[in-house]
Amino acid sequence: MKFSQATILAIFASSALVSAAPANIVSEQTMVKREDVNAIVELINEIKHINQKRDLAEGEDLLELQRRADSVIGELVSALYNSGVIGLVWDKLTTDPSISSSLSNIIKSAIQGAIVQGGALIQAVWNSGLLGDVFNKLINDTDLRQALLDVGKALFNSAANLISIWLGGSSSSSSAAPAAAAAPATNGASKREIMEAAEYLSERDLASILSWIVQTIKDTGIVQSLVNQVINNPDTVISFLTSALKNGLVIVEDLYDWAKQSGLWDQALVYIQNNAGSWIKALAGLFGNALSNGTITASDINNAGSSSKPTGTTTASTATAAPKAATPAAASAAAPKAATSGSSSGSSSNNADLNALINKYGGGSGSTSTPTVDTSGLSSDVNTLVNAAGQAASSLKKRKLY
């Protein structure tokens, strides 16, 4: 398939814009089909045509043209999404200073009005690498701190399990798709031959088209309509918010305040509790760091969330991430002396947790080659697990040298 005439004209029209575009906006790995770009260009040209007719219309004709424009914009959103270029378009729009204020206001209204759902918001936060910033705000917010601790209890069940995953638990995503990284064999064909045979755009042509798409979206005045449709679409809003956060269009402080006003963080925490499988290692790290710096205590985790119960999905994910420390029963099995005690006091439970860590990370053998954990002087308070965890981490590093 060759370029449509509209696409060819778009490439020529955008040639002057390419030199001004960021050089790294399109990578060599970005593969987009010509037919998908043809569809995008044709939809944008249809919007331009509708706008021209709308300038001369009135009454019912004007309303019909407006309805048609809204429909075509919706089709454009789908075409951008399905082609795989929507993230690139958002990156260019969210870094454009001429529309940054307008976009920021749209996002603010959508979050304050709870048009965006908490699950979509927290996914965008995760994708943009800002989960740690949001976690720190939640854990230091007296209104939401306990809700976050309840999620920690639901995910990890105890401070001992949390520390176990933090220090040495294998991530469920670490071996999820190792084979997928291998590209299909090309039998020695050049990149140009592959691209021509598969009808994919070259890097240069794609950069030209993207510049034209973004400039035309701005010139036709559909930025607000486009973004509003995206925000109302759960399939596309995550990509848009990710770009807005990653590129600094919206800062964490503002986002946090807006979402708190509309109750979105409560929704986000529910989403985390029910869908944290691939995040479990990162979450263990955030909670673990909070334990180590004294922001929270092990008792905060152990005593949290009597009403928060892990769902089946959460339990399975946690078990996958750290099968040896998934349940209190597993910890008891690792420390028979503590488990067989008839006492139900907090001291017995804490000792069982501590012994589980010692058995997991060393300390039972007298061999000089086996790293040990010094537990002398430790009280029965489970908060001392944090100190033991630090020693365990050091022991793990030494063990890997042998």
UniProtKB/Swiss-Prot annotation:
Q: Does the keyword Flavoprotein apply?
A: no
Q: Where is this region: Disordered?
A: 302-322
Biased-composition ranges, Low complexity, are 304-322
Which residue positions does the secretion signal occupy? 1-20
Q: Glycosylation annotated at which residues?
A: N140, N293
Query: What is the superkingdom listed in this entry's lineage?
Result: Eukaryota
Cysteines paired by S-S bonds: none
Q: Which UniProt keywords apply?
A: Glycoprotein, Signal
Q: What is this protein called?
A: Opaque-phase-specific protein OP4
Organism of this sequence: Candida albicans (strain WO-1) (Yeast)
